[in-house]
């Protein structure tokens, strides 16, 4: 009976699995650029999209609407990585319906040069539009308009310079 109790309560170490997952996920993230490098790269992409929308379509009233933020990684929950959200750019007055298709084409063209795929429609109705483009390493570009337009880039999971070797 004592042997059965010892066997049933045995020496299982779920903590070992968690440590192994953390090591595995951190090793995968070591293959990626640092969070800071990816933030810098995607900030350039965001600014190129903004500048091209301004020069080609006259959409010029952009401003930074927040400071951005960071969170843990849903895809790598045991890792030391972070997902970052670049500061949101807002366009006062939005994109008129008659310019929406051209604006999406501009966003797709600029973003494609940085490894993003084509635009996936989230909402497309008069006065309200939104697309998302998926990039390398789980990055996302969100572009939408209602009364005002927004341009937001989300950096996929990366280790900070401190945690990257």
Walk through the language-model features, giving the residues of each.
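C-terminal motif of bacterial Sec signal peptides marking the signal peptidase cleavage site
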Residues: 6-10
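An acidic-aromatic pocket/loop used at catalytic or ligand-binding sites
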Residues: 12-57, 94-101, 112, 118-165
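Compositionally biased P/S/T/G-rich terminal and signal peptide-adjacent segments
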Residues: 37, 41-87
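Mature extracytoplasmic domains of secretory-pathway proteins
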Residues: 76-118
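Sec-dependent N-terminal signal peptides
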Residues: 1-3
